[in-house]
């Protein structure tokens, strides 16, 4: 059993990029789907789909198409991923304490009472929450 599914998702994306894969298969959950939606909207991945094939129990598969900046799959769009809030040590921030990732060149993904948001959206909505991860 995976104790931290979000860290597992980020590690799978990082490993797929290192191996120059075009897509990665991740067990589906609603929070992972929202994170994939944000990554697509921000331009870090090409696309994502949910497959009901190879279904284990009630869980489908989230298929993420990795985005590369060149034709040879050598320069991934995501140069770094970091899990911030972990099951053993949660990291919460207020609306005025939301961090800037790489001086504004990256994004922070937060879990707020208004759903999963990027740092810019959370600042605009003036809500704080749990910092899930940084992407740059």
UniProtKB/Swiss-Prot annotation:
Example GO BP: translation
Q: Name one GO molecular function term.
A: structural constituent of ribosome
According to the UniProt record, one GO cellular component term is: ribosome
Provide the leader sequence positions. none
| Alphabetized UniProt keyword annotations | Ribonucleoprotein, Ribosomal protein, RNA-binding, rRNA-binding
Against Pfam families, the record matches this protein to:
Ribosomal_S8
Q: Which family does it belong to?
A: Belongs to the universal ribosomal protein uS8 family.
State whether it acts alone or in a complex, and with which partners, per the record: Part of the 30S ribosomal subunit. Contacts proteins S5 and S12.
Q: What does this protein do?
A: One of the primary rRNA binding proteins, it binds directly to 16S rRNA central domain where it helps coordinate assembly of the platform of the 30S subunit.
For this protein, the record's NCBIfam families field holds: PRK00136.1
Return the protein name.
Answer: Small ribosomal subunit protein uS8
**Name of the gene:** rpsH
């Amino acid at each position: 059993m995976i104790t931290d599914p979000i860290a597992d998702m980020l590690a799978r994306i990082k490993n797929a990029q290192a191996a120059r894969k075009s897509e990665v298969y991740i067990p589906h959950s609603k929070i992972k789907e929202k994170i994939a939606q944000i990554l697509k909207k921000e331009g870090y991945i090409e696309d994502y789909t949910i497959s009901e094939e190879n279904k284990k129990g009630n869980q489908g598969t989230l298929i993420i198409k990795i985005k590369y900046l060149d034709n040879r799959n050598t320069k991934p769009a995501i140069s770094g991923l970091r899990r911030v809030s972990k099951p053993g040590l949660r990291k919460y921030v207020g609306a005025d304490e939301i961090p800037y990732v790489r001086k504004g060149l990256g994004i922070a993904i937060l879990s707020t009472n208004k759903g999963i948001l990027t740092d810019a959206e959370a600042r605009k909505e003036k809500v704080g929450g749990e910092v899930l991860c940084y992407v740059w």
